[in-house]
């Protein structure tokens, strides 16, 4: 199978076998071989050769290609949504919103480029001070499986806009979405070698990250892989590295008047996308006492009515599956381990069908667990922690090595201001779901959640470097010479 796209040509991979499965039916959706180390090198060379021509195009010429890509995404929107749904397991309604986000990324990226990395000039003495930006060159993009179209797109679009050329290694769990996306770029008229598709798993990723011919790497995925990449790039300040690595995100609930609004916001924060968003709430901090008990009772009651279903099920489910049976087993194991260490079941996360990666929402009280693991449990499992006072809640929220998202549900603006001041996270929300990120704002965190390279609206920052110039149209002597220099 022609699984790779290098230098404008589709070719068979020579590396490890990659099979993409529907996570519910286990049907094989895509099968091929990943890129070998030699093919990675071939792609790097193709990108290097394509770089000068692409970088020297005018900004308007590159924008024209990007806008043509947006048009092709719209044309293939139904097919893309279908592909995202069947490969990730997310419901069609949600897959369609992902395609919309991919389309909207073009205009937002153009706006961001002009605002953050465009050209500025002004007089400085007898010269003109000019600020321009240049592309890095050949950059690798490692994409995740949870948003296999939108999140790689969030790196690829601003990278190409800035004049870079791209080596795209998608998740081995979602190769079909990547292939369809690249075909949209081809239809848009992107020149050969400017975007190269390298399917594959761990071995392909290692070969690409280690290739000395790349000038940068943009990654969205797990903390474990991100940390490995950071170590691999240690001592290489000449390479630009942008990492987005998720979080163990806290959501504090204060005593609010509208319990149902709180319950709805908690569910949206914890269980949308089957809990497979980087910003999903992992820890729910609830006040001790009768009000907190009532909130949890209502949350458990409503969550118990949520069923996970196939991506094309009608009527449409709120939740689809997690990405794979392996992921489902790992989440169930994590739940068992927490219960064995003192957690209490409020609503058990279950796998209704043993052969399908469908999980129901789980809610467990981990207040009594002596040493709670500070890990991102990437699925529909919400850990409840009861707190005695608001200061204690903020301290508990910050008790994590991560720092991506944090939220507060409260009727008190004063408490929100206190929470905002003391929260250690890149996204801090008030009375809105944690999962409500926007491409018109930066997206990133601190601590183990990233390396201070916020993406989304700020992706332009890591896709180009600034060049400051002092310019004068003619060479003239200054009115006053520097002391000690005589020209007569």
UniProtKB/Swiss-Prot annotation:
Superkingdom in the source lineage: Bacteria
CDD domains: ALDH_SGSD_AstD
Keyword NAD tagged: yes
EC number annotated for this UniProt entry: 1.2.1.71
Claim: Oxidoreductase is one of the keywords in the record: yes
A Pfam family of this chain: Aldedh
GO terms (BP aspect): arginine catabolic process to glutamate; arginine catabolic process to succinate
Family statement drawn from the similarity comment of this UniProt entry: Belongs to the aldehyde dehydrogenase family. AstD subfamily.
PANTHER family reported for this sequence: ALDEHYDE DEHYDROGENASE-RELATED
Protein name: N-succinylglutamate 5-semialdehyde dehydrogenase
Lineage: Bacteria, Pseudomonadati, Pseudomonadota, Gammaproteobacteria, Pseudomonadales
